[in-house]
Amino acid sequence: MKTCQSSHLDSGVESDIQCRSGSGCVVKCSTERMESAAKRRLAANARERRRMQGLNTAFDRLRKVVPQWGQDKKLSKYETLQMALSYIMALTRILAEAERYSTEREWINLHCEHFHPESYHHYTGQKVATDSDPYAQRIFSYHPEHFQIAN
């Protein structure tokens, strides 16, 4: 004699229903198995939905801390990961570079050297007023001096 598993006992405990005629039990057992499979599928779907919601929330949080060039569209998951990787690598380079210099002052001087008078005119498209140009000396009384960074 065969025994069927009860649909309300998902723990695997066998019921007291014993089958004498095989066809009645097969129908009942297959129905119970289908109901059990449907319940498991619903539970798995709910777990997957929660997992995806958590993943999407994590991507949204990452998008908020990763710098974006334009705010016109939301970055895709792939773009978000690429930007996060680039951002982390840039920050790592900055930290590694800062460790190479013994003082904070040396690091600041390295990054501010392009602000010296002989080079900042190059960035603005202006030429430096020289002593040989009396017109420039008369018109522009201001003479740029070296920038100083306060400690």
From Swiss-Prot:
Domain notes for this protein: The basic motif confers specificity for the CHRNB3 promoter.
Subcellular location: Nucleus; Perikaryon; Cell projection, Axon
Coiled-coil stretches noted in the UniProt entry, renumbered to this chain: none
Molecular functions (GO terms): DNA-binding transcription factor activity, RNA polymerase II-specific; E-box binding; protein dimerization activity; transcription cis-regulatory region binding
InterPro entries attached to this UniProt entry: ATOH7_bHLH, bHLH_dom, bHLH_transcription_factors, HLH_DNA-bd_sf
Induction field: Up-regulated by NGN2 and ATOH7. Down-regulated by HES1.
Domain bHLH residue range list: 39-91
Physiological role: Transcription factor that binds to DNA at the consensus sequence 5'-CAG[GC]TG-3'. Positively regulates the determination of retinal ganglion cell fate and formation of the optic nerve and retino-hypothalamic tract. Required for retinal circadian rhythm photoentrainment. Plays a role in brainstem auditory signaling and binaural processing. During retinal neurogenesis, activates its own transcription, as well as the transcription of CHRNB3 and BRN3.
Gene: ATOH7
Gene3D superfamilies: Helix-loop-helix DNA-binding domain
GO process terms (BP): axon development; circadian rhythm; entrainment of circadian clock by photoperiod; neural retina development; neuron differentiation; neuron fate commitment; optic nerve development; positive regulation of retinal ganglion cell axon guidance
Organism of provenance: Gallus gallus
Identification of the protein by name: Transcription factor ATOH7
GO cellular component annotations of the record: axon; cytosol; nucleoplasm; nucleus; perikaryon
Site (Required for CHRNB3 transcription activation but not for DNA binding): 42-43, 49
UniProt entry keywords in alphabetical sequence: Cell projection, Developmental protein, Differentiation, DNA-binding, Neurogenesis, Nucleus, Transcription, Transcription regulation
